[in-house]
C-alpha cells in the first residue's frame, strides 16, 4: 500500500509532511505529520498518565523507543507520579531527543471540569521545563486528544495558542513542533494555527 493510503477504518497517515509553520518573534511553530519518537529536537513531550508508568498510544510508543531506562528513571525520580496539568522531565534514553517532558493532560469530561485550563497548563509546563533545561527545540504530540477524548478542534486551538503566547515572551525556545499522527488531527492543528493569523 503506498504511503498515505489507508484501508477503510484506518487512520490516514503521511510520514513526515511539514506544510504549515508560522514565525512569532525569533521562534517558529511548526506542524508535522509523523512519528514523534524520530524527531531530532532537544526535547519531546509525552502524553503521559498521572502515574507516569507508560501506557498506550504516544506514551507507549515513546516508552518502547526510549527503552527500559525511561520507566526505571520515572519510577526512581517520580514514585508518586505528577498531577494533571503538570509535566516532569527525564533523559531521552534511546531517543534522538535529549529529554522527554512527561505532560499529564486532562481526560475530557464534556468541558465542564476545567479541561481547557488543565490542557493549557500541561503544554505551558512542558515549555517552562524546556526553558529550564536549556532546550531550544521542543516537539509535542496532541496531548489528551487520543484515549483521553479531548476533541481535536478545541484541543488544537488550546495547544497552538498556548505555544504562541509562550514564545511571544522571553524564551530561548526557537522551534515548537507539533508532531501529529493522523491527517484529521493535523488539519485541526492547521486550523488552529490559521486562527492565530
Predicted segments, located by residue:
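Glycine-/small-residue-enriched capping loops at alpha/beta junctions
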Residues: 2-4, 11-132
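Phosphate/ribose-phosphate-bearing ligand recognition and processing surfaces
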Residues: 12, 107-197
Amino acid at each position: 500500500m503506498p504511503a498515505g493510503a489507508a484501508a477503510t477504518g484506518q487512520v490516514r497517515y503521511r510520514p513526515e509532511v511539514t506544510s504549515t509553520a508560522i514565525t512569532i518573534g525569533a521562534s517558529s511553530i511548526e506542524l508535522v505529520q509523523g512519528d514523534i519518537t524520530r524527531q531530532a529536537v532537544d526535547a519531546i513531550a509525552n502524553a503521559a498518565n498521572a502515574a507516569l508508568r507508560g501506557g498506550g498510544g504516544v506514551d507507549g510508543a515513546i516508552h518502547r523507543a526510549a527503552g527500559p531506562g525511561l520507566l526505571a528513571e520515572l519510577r526512581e525520580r517520580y514514585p508518586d507520579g505528577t498531577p494533571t496539568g503538570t509535566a516532569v522531565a527525564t533523559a531521552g534514553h534511546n531517543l534522538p531527543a535529549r529529554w522527554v517532558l512527561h505532560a499529564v493532560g486532562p481526560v475530557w469530561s464534556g468541558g465542564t471540569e476545567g479541561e481547557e485550563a488543565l490542557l493549557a497548563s500541561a503544554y505551558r509546563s512542558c515549555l517552562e521545563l524546556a526553558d529550564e533545561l536549556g532546550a531550544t527545540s521542543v516537539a509535542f504530540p496532541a496531548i489528551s486528544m487520543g484515549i483521553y477524548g479531548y476533541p481535536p478542534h478545541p484541543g488544537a486551538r488550546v495547544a497552538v495558542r498556548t505555544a504562541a503566547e509562550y514564545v511571544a515572551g522571553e524564551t530561548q525556545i526557537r522551534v515548537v513542533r507539533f508532531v501529529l499522527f493522523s491527517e484529521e488531527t493535523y488539519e485541526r492543528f492547521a486550523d488552529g494555527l490559521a486562527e492565530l493569523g
